[in-house]
């Protein structure tokens, strides 16, 4: 009798344990890619009854954002619709406070146990918030190189003198491939080329939704510095006139920037965004690894000079600033090519 009672109690205990919702919390998940910097999910609660996203929002103070009632999570091909919220009303304008930061909660249907990641899709409109590959496995670091990057572009760049400018005219072709692309992520890529003759020229190309590729083609006059914009991913590179080069854009840079923003005490470390072939491949790799920053004079700070200076005083001030800047460049722990580039741009 005692054995039967004990067996019954054990059976009931196992049943209760199996019927209890398995709650799990994922803190600070990695985000694979995003089309926006407005939203972040620093905490996710998973159970057998719901998936709860704790959302941090960042936007201009006194401007509004909106969460569509048709928002859903996409995991392994299945949609899990928005079922509730706290702190925000779907389909209504949410006005940002003075700080430009706010928090709220979004509740969705439960994800199956073992789900490794999901996409957050705020409806299917072109400009709706989309965050891709939100990790649920506890990963702490991004891979060293984005998936799909050719092996030839994974080698360390060679240091040396800054390549000579090419004074020629030609048709330049830039073949763009988005690494980590998902359909609907972005519609086009834009390149702003600083031309010797025409100032800054804008060139855009539609992204093929099937392959995540685009081609930019334009007339170019001399070596040019260009800025590249693709959704939230922004970078710069140097291009030679008349060349055909391949450009790989790491779309994970958008997700990485969101994750790095969580540590408000630490300056985000620049991560690679652009990988290029071509005449300036090594220079572009060093520039991109530095976040596109160089040591140079800031002529637009508002306190560069005093308008009451005489010509001689102004000249001496500029010379002193340049000498101080050159000394800072010489002592900086960067590659020689980057030091030379900083001097050339100063």
Sequence positions of predicted segments:
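Bacterial Sec-dependent N-terminal signal peptides
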Residues: 1-25
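Beta-strand-rich interaction surfaces with strong enrichment in secreted/lumenal proteins
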Residues: 41-43, 91-97, 107-108, 163, ...
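Short, solvent-exposed, Trp/other aromatic-anchored flexible loops in extracytoplasmic proteins
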Residues: 83-125
């Amino acid at each position: 009798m005692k054995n039967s009672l004990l067996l019954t109690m054990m059976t009931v205990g196992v049943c209760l344990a199996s019927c209890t919702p398995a709650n799990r919390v994922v803190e600070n998940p990695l985000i694979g890619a995003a089309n926006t910097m407005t939203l972040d999910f620093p905490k996710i609660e998973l159970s057998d009854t719901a998936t709860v996203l704790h959302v941090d929002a960042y936007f201009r103070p006194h401007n509004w954002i909106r969460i569509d009632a048709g928002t859903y999570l996409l995991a392994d091909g299945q949609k899990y619709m928005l079922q509730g919220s706290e702190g925000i009303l779907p389909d209504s304008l949410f006005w940002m406070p003075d700080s430009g930061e706010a928090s709220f909660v979004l509740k969705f249907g439960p994800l199956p146990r073992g789900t490794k990641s999901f996409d957050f899709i705020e409806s299917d409109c072109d400009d709706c918030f989309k965050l891709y590959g939100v990790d649920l496995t506890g990963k702490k670091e991004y891979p060293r190189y984005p998936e799909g990057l050719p092996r030839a572009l994974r080698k360390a760049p060679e240091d040396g003198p800054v390549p000579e400018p090419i004074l020629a005219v030609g048709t330049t072709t830039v073949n763009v491939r988005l690494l980590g692309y998902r359909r609907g992520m972005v519609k086009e890529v834009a390149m702003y080329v600083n031309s010797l003759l025409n100032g800054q020229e804008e060139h855009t190309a539609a992204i093929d939704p099937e392959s995540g590729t685009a081609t930019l083609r334009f007339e170019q006059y001399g070596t040019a510095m260009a800025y590249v914009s693709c959704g939230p991913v922004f970078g710069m590179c140097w291009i030679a006139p008349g060349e055909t080069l391949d450009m790989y854009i790491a779309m994970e840079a958008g997700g990485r920037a969101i994750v790095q923003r969580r540590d408000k005490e630490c300056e985000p470390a620049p991560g690679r965004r652009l990988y290029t072939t071509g005449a300036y491949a090594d220079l572009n790799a060093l520039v991109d690894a530095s976040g596109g920053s160089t040591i140079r004079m800031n002529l637009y700070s508002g306190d560069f000079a005093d308008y009451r200076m005489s010509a001689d005083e102004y000249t001496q001030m500029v010379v002193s600033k340049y000498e101080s800047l050159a000394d800072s460049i010489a002592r900086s722990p960067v590659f020689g090519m980057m030091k030379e580039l900083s001097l050339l741009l100063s």
